[in-house]
């Protein structure tokens, strides 16, 4: 497996979106930055908030795009191109409708599953889908017509606790990824379910 050199947390910019389910990826990157003792700063060259962190002796770039979700690839493409980072060296954290709150999973490759952030990243990486994803479960409203309002809404307190617990576990699993490997990180994260 390639070493991860860029970790991206997908989000919509602005205070009105900060606590919405669609920003779960950003919550994970912010927690990772806190653990690493770094602060993300705005960098217009990469259309996002960025930081350089060190995890178990390995350099990694952190990125939260400040474009809207459907333009996330602009930020990812700009940073990846500048630092010559390949898709296999990228981990993108995003909210996942198909997993319940309290569950998170790593995955390599695959489609975008209707997620506009992933869709744009795939397009900007020359249709290369072969990047890693961290899928953070937010649950599904039950009706596909309600998805937009659901992802742009805030989770009730109990659901938010479950999402936060899964993010904490995802951060610990990311440390295992950098210290050991993806298989061990997956084994740990995929056996976790917050109650």
Swiss-Prot record:
The record marks 95 as: Stabilizes the basic form of H active site to accept a proton. It is found in: Cytoplasm. It catalyses: an N-acyl-L-alpha-aminoacyl-tRNA + H2O = an N-acyl-L-amino acid + a tRNA + H(+). One of its GO terms (cellular component) is cytoplasm. This is Peptidyl-tRNA hydrolase. TRNA binds at residues 17, 68, 70, 116. The record marks 12 as: Discriminates between blocked and unblocked aminoacyl-tRNA. The active site is at residue 22. Monomer. GO terms for molecular function: peptidyl-tRNA hydrolase activity; tRNA binding. Keywords: Cytoplasm, Hydrolase, RNA-binding, tRNA-binding. Hydrolyzes ribosome-free peptidyl-tRNAs (with 1 or more amino acids incorporated), which drop off the ribosome during protein synthesis, or as a result of ribosome stalling. Catalyzes the release of premature peptidyl moieties from peptidyl-tRNA molecules trapped in stalled 50S ribosomal subunits, and thus maintains levels of free tRNAs and 50S ribosomes. Its EC number is 3.1.1.29. It is an enzyme of class 3 (hydrolase). Its main location: cytoplasm. The gene is pth. It comes from the Bacteria. Pfam families: Pept_tRNA_hydro (PF01195). GO terms for biological process: protein quality control for misfolded or incompletely synthesized proteins; rescue of stalled ribosome. Belongs to the PTH family.
């Amino acid at each position: 497996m390639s070493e991860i050199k860029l970790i991206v947390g997908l989000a919509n910019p602005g205070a009105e979106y900060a606590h919405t389910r669609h920003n779960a990826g950003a919550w994970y990157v912010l927690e990772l930055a806190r653990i690493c003792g770094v602060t993300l700063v705005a960098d217009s060259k990469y259309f996002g908030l960025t930081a350089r962190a060190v995890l178990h002796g390995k350099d990694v770039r952190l990125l939260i795009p400040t474009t809207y979700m459907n333009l996330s690839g602009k930020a990812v493409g700009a940073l990846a191109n500048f630092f010559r980072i390949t898709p296999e060296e990228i981990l993108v954290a995003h909210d996942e409708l198909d997993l319940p709150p309290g569950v998170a999973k790593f995955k390599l490759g695959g489609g975008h599953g209707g997620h506009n952030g992933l869709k744009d990243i795939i397009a900007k990486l020359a249709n290369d889908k072969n990047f890693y994803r961290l899928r953070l479960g937010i649950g599904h409203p039950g009706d596909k017509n309600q998805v937009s309002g659901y992802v742009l809404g805030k989770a009730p307190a109990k659901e938010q606790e479950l999402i936060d617990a899964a993010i904490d576990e995802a951060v610990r699993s990311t440390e295992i990824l950098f210290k050991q490997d993806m298989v061990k990180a997956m084994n740990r994260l995929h056996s976790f379910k917050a109650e």
